[in-house]
Amino acid sequence: MAPKAEKKPAEKKPAEEKKAVAEKAPAEKKPKAGKKLPKEGGAAAGDKKKKRVKKSVETYKIYIFKVLKQVHPDIGISSKAMGIMNSFINDIFEKLAQEASRLARYNKKPTITSREIQTAVRLVLPGELAKHAVSEGTKAVTKFTSS
């Protein structure tokens, strides 16, 4: 069915162009830019539309790998272990965000600041880990504000 539809306009073009070229030219330009190009491809254009564009998924894999190489340069990590580490970091960040949000609501403030994040870290992470995280976070914020 599609090839017949394409042949008929092709046959009509020479006859119509002889009659009114000025009327046909503006009508052809608009569909070519927007509608005619996908239709001319036929099945090929349909296949291209069916292909899904991959969503860019943000992961922490490259950062986990960089930290691993800083700590143990000679050790590798399997893809399954990397996936587990990525899930772990996502879970921790989720908990920190929820706790920081709760703290902001308790204090009736619309904004989560570094103070809420710091308190959330102290509440979510245990003991010595919280102390190290707070000191590293403070160092990072200081470096960011100074530059």
Curated annotation (Swiss-Prot):
GO cellular component: nucleosome; nucleus
InterPro entries reported in the protein's UniProt record: Histone-fold, Histone_H2A/H2B/H3, Histone_H2B, HISTONE_H2B_site
SMART domains: H2B
Primary gene name: HIS2B
Modified residues (N6-acetyllysine): 7, 35-36
Region Disordered, annotated ranges: 1-55
Function recorded in the entry: Core component of nucleosome. Nucleosomes wrap and compact DNA into chromatin, limiting DNA accessibility to the cellular machineries which require DNA as a template. Histones thereby play a central role in transcription regulation, DNA repair, DNA replication and chromosomal stability. DNA accessibility is regulated via a complex set of post-translational modifications of histones, also called histone code, and nucleosome remodeling.
GO MF terms, alphabetically ordered: DNA binding; protein heterodimerization activity; structural constituent of chromatin
PANTHER family (alphabetical): HISTONE H2B
Keyword Metal-binding: no
Ranges of compositional bias, category Basic and acidic residues: 1-31
Record's protein name: Histone H2B
Keyword check for Nucleus: yes
Entry's family note: Belongs to the histone H2B family.
PROSITE patterns the UniProt entry points to: HISTONE_H2B
UniProt keyword list: Acetylation, Chromosome, DNA-binding, Isopeptide bond, Nucleosome core, Nucleus, Ubl conjugation
Cystine crosslinks: none
Protein's cellular compartments: Nucleus; Chromosome
Processing after translation: Can be acetylated to form H2BK6ac, H2BK33ac and H2BK34ac. Monoubiquitinated to form H2BK143ub1; may give a specific tag for epigenetic transcriptional activation.
Subunit description: The nucleosome is a histone octamer containing two molecules each of H2A, H2B, H3 and H4 assembled in one H3-H4 heterotetramer and two H2A-H2B heterodimers. The octamer wraps approximately 147 bp of DNA.
Cross-link Glycyl lysine isopeptide (Lys-Gly) (interchain with G-Cter in ubiquitin), where in sequence: 143
SUPFAM superfamilies recorded: Histone-fold (SSF47113)
